């Protein structure tokens, strides 16, 4: 069994960071690849929601999604929030896995405790379990941003998902930040001056 871990929302200016972990065997992973699984950024939103449902409802797939709010990111830092979320996933799911793969190049020092942990750059393109985790993290972020968009339509979050697009930055300059913005990001980039 392999545990794959990935995140969504790391570079967003607004909303939460979501980190997901998925554990399953290689046969199940292959079944998901046959369903069209790949890096969530390369899937349509409808396909992501379809795959999310299949992942969450599969008897032989175990998963965990951790949410870190904008407030937590502002008070603790993005890096600390990422590490805490990954630790929480490892505590819950690592006993089920022989191999642990994290997307990216940072193990947050956790490979000292988990000797079977590997970081894989572009892992969501190479390891099915990471791609499955990518789907769960991204659909969680998508859902949050659609809910927030209903409250603050002017920022275009239904399209930009909270990333720093031209329209989003112009809306911050014109309307100011919302309570859901990561104020540490906005201050760093002088959006309030």
From Swiss-Prot:
InterPro entries: RNase_HII (IPR022898), RNase_HII/HIII (IPR001352), RNase_HII/HIII_dom (IPR024567), RNaseH-like_sf (IPR012337), RNaseH_sf (IPR036397). GO terms for cellular component: cytoplasm; ribonuclease H2 complex. HAMAP family: RNase_HII_B. A divalent metal cation binds at residues 6-7, 103. Its cofactor is Mn(2+); Mg(2+). Residues 1-193 form the RNase H type-2 domain. GO terms for biological process: DNA replication, removal of RNA primer; mismatch repair. It is found in: Cytoplasm. It catalyses: Endonucleolytic cleavage to 5'-phosphomonoester. This is Ribonuclease HII. Pfam families: RNase_HII. Endonuclease that specifically degrades the RNA of RNA-DNA hybrids. It comes from the Bacteria. Keywords: Cytoplasm, Endonuclease, Hydrolase, Manganese, Metal-binding, Nuclease. Belongs to the RNase HII family. The keyword Lipoprotein does not apply. Its main location: cytoplasm. Manganese or magnesium. Binds 1 divalent metal ion per monomer in the absence of substrate. May bind a second metal ion after substrate binding. The keyword Calcium does not apply. GO terms for molecular function: manganese ion binding; RNA binding; RNA-DNA hybrid ribonuclease activity. Its EC number is 3.1.26.4.
